[in-house]
A protein has these predicted regions:
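Active-site-proximal beta-alpha core segment in soluble small-molecule metabolic enzymes
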Residues: 2-11, 32-161
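Positively charged, low-complexity intrinsically disordered leader regions
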Residues: 5-29
Length: 161
């Protein structure tokens, strides 16, 4: 295939994005938190640009895939809470703490590992506990036979140093 025929791109209308955010905000109400997912460079639309707009518009949180994406936002003036949905190596816990980034945790072992590293750093790591709601992908299992152990794991994760 001739590469000159493949000139595809996406143009983002920031006014339309702001309008869409406002429409969603009105629909969900002020008492519901809004998390904008900007992983993978906001799906190719420019994570810093989209994050700035969401921050200025009053969104509550941002979510990214990796620590690199989160730190890039911090280095570009994004101060709102950022959640990493993917895995972060324990060696990066000090960077998470330094940049005030929240890490998703999917199991007890990972929560304990992160807690141990945070204690070594002398800091506190913010975590978000993922709960598997039925897709059987990631998170604490809290249904059927796993309900009791899942709830216990979540409670334990909430009290780690």
């Amino acid at each position: 295939m001739d590469s000159t025929l493949r000139r595809t791109w996406a143009e983002i209308d920031m006014d339309a994005l702001a309008h869409n955010y406002e429409t969603l905000r009105k629909r969900i109400g002020e008492n519901v938190k809004f998390l904008g997912v900007v992983k993978a460079d906001a799906y190719g639309h420019g994570s810093v640009q989209v994050s700035r707009l969401l921050q200025e518009s009053g969104a509550d949180y941002l979510a990214v895939s990796s620590i690199d994406e989160a730190v890039e936002l911090r280095h570009n003036g994004i101060t709102m809470p950022v959640l990493i949905l993917g895995h972060t190596p324990k060696e990066e816990v000090s960077e998470l703490i330094k940049n005030n980034i929240t890490q998703a945790v999917t199991c007890r072992a990972k929560a304990l590992e992160y807690s141990e590293e945070a204690v070594k750093c002398g800091g506190t790591l913010k975590i978000h506990i993922k709960v598997d709601t039925g897709m059987s992908r990631l998170g604490y299992l809290c249904d059927g036979d796993y309900f009791e152990s899942g709830v216990e794991g979540i409670c334990e994760g909430c009290t780690l140093p």
